[in-house]
């Protein structure tokens, strides 16, 4: 399928989030000819740096990690086939807040402290320009509780409202039909833990889902995108984020700075937050993010 009428917007908090949770989906839709737009809310300045030779870039040293990660993200987008990328408000407008409770939560420019209306107005401008039928971000809990993920959810929900409001701002109003949050079913994680346990890789193994810090009950997952054919693109994108991610030389496995092994999924899962639900296909779920939209499925 090649359909330039399909337009989808992904709103992510930091560089690498797009590749970890939605990389295969982005690569699939880009390869099919859809307009895939990625908006990143921060530069990821507070990330923990894996390569020892680059640790001088850390926020408590030279504080130049953010600018370095711009290059990583550019390389990752190229691997995914994504040509439309923007930083919300421009590169560096908002700063990575760090994990919940960290002193960096109090930085005056951190995204956690951003005025939601201001950030939403800027995102609404992008929505009106791109005119996506589908928007993807996180749930209200921020997937695993990161303050920037929570804020990205709040900003995206409000921006979608503003973009559709004829009384708001300049430009032609646009109503994005569907809003999704990233999600991983607990049963999928359980199978992944078993696979990680029985496979060869250099990472630490976990024995329970709770050790991963994310995963949702299966009945909350409405949609699965089978993008296994695009897993190589996702792995290439993960490798591009070398300050944050290590990818195994064998198998679809990776780890962040905590060295806990995770599976890179080719099938990616979502929860429909708002909009028409398409017909159930796989495991009672939609089989695509454009499902239920006439002429776009």
Swiss-Prot record:
Keywords: Hydrolase, Metal-binding, Zinc. Belongs to the MshB deacetylase family. This is 1D-myo-inositol 2-acetamido-2-deoxy-alpha-D-glucopyranoside deacetylase. It comes from Thermomonospora curvata (strain ATCC 19995 / DSM 43183 / JCM 3096 / KCTC 9072 / NBRC 15933 / NCIMB 10081 / Henssen B9). It comes from the Bacteria. GO terms for molecular function: N-acetylglucosaminylinositol deacetylase activity; zinc ion binding. Pfam families: PIG-L. It is an enzyme of class 3 (hydrolase). It catalyses: 1D-myo-inositol 2-acetamido-2-deoxy-alpha-D-glucopyranoside + H2O = 1D-myo-inositol 2-amino-2-deoxy-alpha-D-glucopyranoside + acetate. NCBIfam families: mycothiol_MshB (TIGR03445). Gene3D superfamilies: LmbE-like (3.40.50.10320).
